[in-house]
Design a protein with these regions (language model features):
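Catalytic active-site module of serine/aspartate enzymes centered on a nucleophile-bearing elbow/loop
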Residues: 253-283
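Flexible "cap/lid" loop of the alpha/beta hydrolase fold
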Residues: 116-121, 125-164
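Conserved HGGG/HGGXW glycine-rich cap/lid loop of the alpha/beta-hydrolase fold
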Residues: 24-80
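Acidic catalytic loop of the alpha/beta-hydrolase fold
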Residues: 234-238
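Conserved alpha/beta-hydrolase catalytic His-Asp/Glu region
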Residues: 141, 145-149, 160-221
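Alpha/beta-hydrolase fold catalytic core
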Residues: 1-38, 59-62, 100-101, 281-283
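Short beta-strand/loop motif that positions the catalytic acidic residue
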Residues: 223, 229-231
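Conserved acidic catalytic loop of the alpha/beta-hydrolase fold
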Residues: 86-103
Length: 283
């Protein structure tokens, strides 16, 4: 007996590249019909990281818009600033051009930090709900009054490694990306490293500086909209302490722990990740 496999219909054909400033175009994956869900990827990655989310979300009657940040994936890679404000402005311009309203904004890792800065600067323009997944929020590095996650000097070492042996940098993150070295199969690991190598070295380093230095604690208190925080309990890149601090910092937030996941909760527990996102976005 055979089981019929349904192919997801992505709906209308839309622009794959959007110009956010002269000579800078961002790669956009835009499919489906319904309430918009806007996906922002993490450091080193691109909108391709959400491959195992797109079909489920489109099938559940959402319009899914994956934005690849400048410097990464198939987007343009200009020299210049790569702080959170620049990325937030790029997102604003994409959503302006697409005339998006009532969106669910999803940010993974560094993408979560950029999503928080976006909402803080632009007062929630185009967006009605926020999802933070394994987010580098409110800080990625520790301070005297924030004793969590990495030392700033550890990030300096990563910046040096980026300039001297970028494949080694990617191999290091591949080893700590999941809960255990075998949580993701070798093929998935190679796929992620391939995406990572498509990033520019310049953007990779400058985004590490933004991750190292940016404090979003004052941004969090400006977020009033409903917020879903999803975070792996075994995350070695953005420790679970960050999720607890973020949950405490956003008044209207709920935290869902992924007990079996490291940083790659969207892959290690993809079914749960998609179900939680669909449930939250559909309310």
């Amino acid at each position: 007996m055979t089981t019929k496999v349904d192919i997801v219909n992505s709906g209308a054909t839309r622009a794959e590249y959007i110009e956010v400033e002269p000579n800078v175009k961002l790669h956009i994956s835009d499919g489906g019909e319904g309430r918009p869900i806007v996906l922002i990827h993490g450091w080193l990655l691109s909108d391709e990281m959400y491959e195992y989310q797109y079909n489920d979300l489109i099938k559940n009657k959402f319009r899914v818009i994956g934005i690849t940040l400048r410097g990464f994936g198939k987007s343009d890679k200009p020299y210049g600033n790569y702080n959170y404000d620049v990325h937030a402005l790029d997102i604003k311009r994409v959503l302006d051009i697409l005339e998006i309203n009532d969106a669910v904004l999803v940010g993974f890792s560094m993408g979560g930090a950029i999503a928080v800065r976006y909402l803080s600067i632009y007062s929630g323009a185009h967006v009605s709900k926020l999802v933070l997944a394994g987010a580098a929020v409110p800080l990625w590095t520790n301070r005297k009054d924030f004793p969590y996650n990495l030392n700033q000097s550890s990030v300096d070492d990563l910046i040096i490694l980026n300039y001297t042996d970028r494949p080694k940098l990617l191999n290091y993150f591949a080893r700590i990306f999941s809960a255990t070295p075998t949580s993701l199969n070798k093929g998935i690991g190679n796929w992620l490293k391939g995406i990572g190598l498509s990033a520019s070295s310049y953007a990779t380093a400058h985004c590490l500086v933004a991750l190292r230095d940016t404090d979003l604690r004052e941004d969090l208190v400006k977020i009033k909209m409903a917020t879903l925080i999803m975070h792996g309990k075994k995350d070695k890149i953005c420790s679970f302490d960050l999720a607890l601090q973020t949950n405490a910092g956003i008044a209207n937030s709920q935290l869902v722990a992924f007990e079996e996941s490291g940083h790659s909760l969207f892959l290690e527990e993809s079914e749960k990740f998609n179900d939680e996102l669909i449930k939250f976005a559909g309310k």
